[in-house]
Amino acid sequence: MEQVVIVDAIRTPMGRSKGGAFRNVRAEDLSAHLMRSLLARNPALEAAALDDIYWGCVQQTLEQGFNIARNAALLAEVPHSVPAVTVNRLCGSSMQALHDAARMIMTGDAQACLVGGVEHMGHVPMSHGVDFHPGLSRNVAKAAGMMGLTAEMLARMHGISREMQDAFAARSHARAWAATQSGAFKNEIIPTGGHDADGVLKQFNYDEVIRPETTVEALATLRPAFDPVSGTVTAGTSSALSDGAAAMLVMSESRARDLGLKPRACVRSMAVVGCDPSIMGYGPVPASKLALKKAGLSASDIGVFEMNEAFAAQILPCIKDLGLMEQIDEKINLNGGAIALGHPLGCSGARISTTLLNLMERKDVQFGLATMCIGLGQGIATVFERV
């Protein structure tokens, strides 16, 4: 079986969805920009030698519809002979895109793929066109379709207080801002064209979603966003709304070596699981455990974790049940997470994996794990190993 390696990984800055940097930039353009950038950064690989493009996107309508993967590839002037497919596993879409490409390479059906994802939540809102079948309520609580209420449920089940949530959210912003100031994101962010507040076209090379002024005291003043009577989850402890894309160059180890491209890491194992939709945010726990089992590892073997921060009330129970509460500041989301950077749905799996690879190199650790919860009750995880 072929060894699957990550040769390169990049992302756009994360733009605010409401009047942000990418308010006049389409999702296809964000995607095409990264496709072109990956190929330009790795000239030893001819674009025509790509076997496929796997691109995650959740709201596949309007500008994100009609196979955005192919549309973006055409905009990027990837040769017409290279196919492309859009992948949808809701929040896990671009990580699923990685898994799909990895399996193609493992079986010998592909040697080189572009992988990534995008979501422009300013242009195509998360709830646009949603129409759940009324019969679902016979088997699943109606609130399972309301992500904020699933986070409230997890908080109550696991004893996650409002104070714990506020502290974690403040940490996310502080860590993300520190990473920005120190240049920790420089190796992953590709400057991307957008418009500033005055409408002037400029290149953005930083995440505009981060709020460095965030404090626990300020967060404590916010009202519950989803359960106004007894809730603890606020807008400040939820992932921000943002627009962005992320991309990876994934190859067989043999092809990378033949081309003189240095692999950054290999895919050690992959897992996806289902869980109760009413606590959809718990999915990373069984997914991570299964991925670790497949890799022959334990949580203690992992040097760095990237766990998508859908809500502070969601990620804290996952950290707790993976036995990592005492290691948060040493291993978990060291550059902040989606509470500060936002969670562009189809982008996030590739985004957290990209950040993870850079952290693994900076911290000089052998193993890293990226995982995320998925709406309606799923979890997805990937174990990476440096090579």
Curated annotation (Swiss-Prot):
Enzyme nomenclature, EC number: 2.3.1.16
GO terms, molecular function: acetyl-CoA C-acyltransferase activity
GO cellular component annotations of the record: cytoplasm
InterPro entries reported in the protein's UniProt record: FadA, Thiolase, Thiolase-like, Thiolase-like_sf_Thiolase, Thiolase_acyl_enz_int_AS, Thiolase_AS, Thiolase_C, Thiolase_CS
Pfam families referenced in this protein's UniProt entry, alphabetically: Thiolase_C, Thiolase_N
Main location class: cytoplasm
Biological role stated in the UniProt entry: Catalyzes the final step of fatty acid oxidation in which acetyl-CoA is released and the CoA ester of a fatty acid two carbons shorter is formed. Involved in the aerobic and anaerobic degradation of long-chain fatty acids.
Full protein name: 3-ketoacyl-CoA thiolase
Gene name in the database record: fadA
